[in-house]
Amino acid sequence: MTVVEAKNISKFYGNKYLGKTIPALDNVSLSINKGNIFALLGPNGAGKTTLFKILLGILPVTTGKAFILGLPPENPLSRKKAGYLPENPEFPSHLTAAKLLRFAGRLYGLDKSIITERSNELLRLLGMEKWAGTKIVNFSKGMVQRIGIAQALISDPEILFLDEPTDGIDAIGKAEVKKILKSLKSKGTTIIINSHLLSEVETIADTVCILSRGKVIKISSVDELTTQECQYEIETESEKSSIEIPPEMGKVRFLAANKLLITLNHDEDINNVIDFLRKNEVKIKTIKPLKVSLEDSFIETIKRSGPQQQFDKDI
C-alpha cells in the first residue's frame, strides 16, 4: 500500500520572470509503501530537505503533485497522522521537556489523558525521564535531538519524517534510536529519513533514494546497492591448490586455501560456474555475493551522475 507519493515534483527558487532560478527539485517522482524505512541520500544541495518540506506542506511546489495517505499536502488532514523532526530543531527554550510534549500533543488535538500517558512513555523510551522538568535551554545537542524525536512520536504517527535524526547523539544513543525505529517499523510505521550517516542508513533502511542536483538518480533496495555485481565469494569444504573456470565465464582468485573470489563476465553465469565446479569435484560450502558499503556505492553513483553544485548546507 502506497502511503507517500510524489509525482513529477519540481521546485524552483528565484524569479522566473528575470530568468534567474535555481532548481531545488527537478521532476522528482517516488512512492513509499506502508511499513517501509525509506532513506533520502544526496550531497548538500541535492534537494532532500526541500522534498521533506513539500511533502509536509511547509513549502509549495512549483509543478507536480504530492500525496500523504491519499491527501495533498495543502490539506491539513494530510499531516494529522504524520510526525516530523526537522534538521537542527529549535524549540521554545523556556519550555521543559514535559511541557514541550504536552504542547505538541495539544497541537495534534489529543486528549489530556492521552498526552500525559504518551509523554511519560516517550520520555522513558528516549532516556529523558529524569530531565522531564528541565528547560530545553539547558539541553545539550543530543538531548534536543532526543526530545525532538519524542515530540515527533507524540501522536503515534503512521508516517514519521526524520531529518538527520541522530545528529549530535552519542554512539549509545544512536544504537537506541535505531532500535526504536526498527520497533516502529515492525508495528507498521512508515519512516522517511534524511541522513548523511550512510553506515547508519545501511543497517536500518529498506529502500534508498539518491538525489543529485534536484533529480532522482536511483531508487533501490539497500541489498541491491551494496551487492557487487558479477563478484561472488565461494567457500569450499576442503583446501584446493588451484581451480580454474572457463575464461568465457570469468576468472578465479584465491582469497585463502578454501576461499575463492569469482569474477564473472556476466552475472547470469553464476549457476553455470556452480555446475562446473561441482562437476570438477569442488564441494561448495557457502556462496555469497560480494558486498560493498552503502557509502562506496553512493559515492560511485554520485560520481557517475556528473559534476556537483557546491552548497554549504542542504536545500
PLM features per residue range, with description:
Residues 178-264:
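ABC transporter nucleotide-binding domain
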Residues 306-314:
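Short, charged, intrinsically disordered terminal tails
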Residues 79, 101, 116, 123, ...:
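Generic structural signal for individual residues within well-ordered alpha-helical segments
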Residues 2-6, 11-212, 218:
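ABC transporter nucleotide-binding domains
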Residues 109, 206, 230, 303-307:
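Non-catalytic alpha-helical coupling and interface elements of nucleotide-dependent molecular machines
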Residues 231-304:
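Short, charged/small-residue-rich alpha-helical element at the C-terminal edge
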